[in-house]
Amino acid sequence: MKPRVTFDSRGSSGNIFSVLAITQTALRKERRINDFNECRDRVFASHSYDEALSIIREYVDLTDERGEK
């Protein structure tokens, strides 16, 4: 089961680096450091915000508080 991560796409937590930080915390709690490192590397290589969020969603249950994206 994927850990749940909530962010606000229109607030400061919508910044992709903030989303990654929240994701890192969630995955570390489950001792999935290698998964986070892989996720981070793939996000850094992505070409858009939407692509980055799509990658992150492969690792965590990512939910926008505003119901967007």
Enumerate the predicted regions with their spans.
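Long, contiguous binding/interaction regions
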Residues: 1-69
